[in-house]
Design a protein with these regions (language model features):
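Phosphate-group recognition and catalysis centered on beta-loop-alpha active-site segments
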Residues: 1-295
Length: 295
């Protein structure tokens, strides 16, 4: 059994967490972009981002394992160098390019809690995860703001036990059905759904599929003192349902309400400019591009 990671800071249990930042394609603000991160900070939200590796091992802030959905390029992210990826424009962004984790850490600079997802590199939630966790740990050594790392793949977190013992680590979890996880063996899916990796990893929290929060395994994790976040609510109604069991929500597709006493947040800036060309978050529903609806 690994030693328990530090508890999730209270900052993650206050303001709702913007899924891939506060993105709105109609305004030219793309998921996991610098603009989406800035918008989330200005609105007083926490931030969730995704990490994929470049060919050189650098940690890139990008959700998909291929470039096709969000850029004019094609092919695997891991086949391009960080330098090359940093020159690729995100579509409909007005020229924004793919950022590195180091750039996003410098941008956030402790002004909002930052939840970092390590994307699965094995393809079936197995042990072949590469050195991405080590690179993330290296980048977080000097970071002073509220930060936590999580993954669907327990193996992706294993290197952090020794490499980043002061960083809270958690598992992203769900019901792990065969329909959604066809490459994962049935026995392994059952173990993942039962949250059997929590104790061996010393995980301090989970981020669970919101529709499955009443799972006995989730209730047991909460009773054991682990924080329970959830993903991904897309309306005030879904948020109300999720909050009956979850300590906080990851959201997109609308503007979640920020509690006035939310811990760990910078004071929200005035509402962004709603004029044409400005970010009109306060004037109309937040919209997202078509894409994966998972975490």
């Amino acid at each position: 059994m690994s030693s328990r990671s530090p508890d999730l800071p209270g900052a993650f249990l206050g303001a709702p967490i913007a899924h891939r930042g506060l993105h709105d394609r109609a305004c030219g603000v793309i998921e996991n972009s610098r603009g989406a991160i800035r918008a989330a900070i200005e609105a007083g939200y926490g931030i969730e981002i995704d990490i994929q590796p470049a060919a050189c091992g650098e940690a890139m802030v990008f959700h998909d394992d291929t470039l096709d959905r969000l850029t004019a390029e094609t092919g695997a992210v891991r086949e391009r160098s960080a330098e090359a990826l940093g020159r690729i424009a995100l579509t409909a962004s007005g020229g924004e390019t793919i950022p590195t984790l180091g750039e996003i850490l410098a941008l956030v600079d402790g002004r909002a809690p930052l939840l970092i997802e390590i994307k699965d590199q094995d393809g079936a939630l197995g042990p072949d995860v590469g050195p991405l966790g080590d690179r993330i740990a290296e980048l977080l050594v000097e970071y002073a703001g509220p930060v936590a790392v999580m993954s669907f793949n327990p193996a992706a977190l294993a290197s952090l036990v020794e490499a980043a013992p002061r960083i809270p680590r958690g598992l992203i979890t769900c019901d792990f059905t065969a329909e959604h996880w066809p490459r994962v063996p049935a026995e392994r899916r059952a173990a993942l759904a039962a949250l059997r990796d929590l104790e061996p990893l010393g995980a301090a929290f989970i981020s669970h599929q919101w529709r499955d929060l009443s799972s006995p395994a989730v209730l047991a994790a909460k009773a054991a003192g682990r924080a329970v976040l959830c993903w991904t609510v897309r309306s005030p109604r879904e948020e109300r349902i999720a909050r009956a069991l979850a300590d906080n929500v990851t959201f997109e597709g609308y503007l979640a309400e920020v509690p006035e006493d939310a811990p760990g947040q910078s004071a929200p800036s005035p509402a962004p400019d709603p004029r044409p060309g400005g970010l009109g978050w306060r004037r109309r529903p937040h919209r997202q591009p078509a894409g994966p609806r998972g975490h």
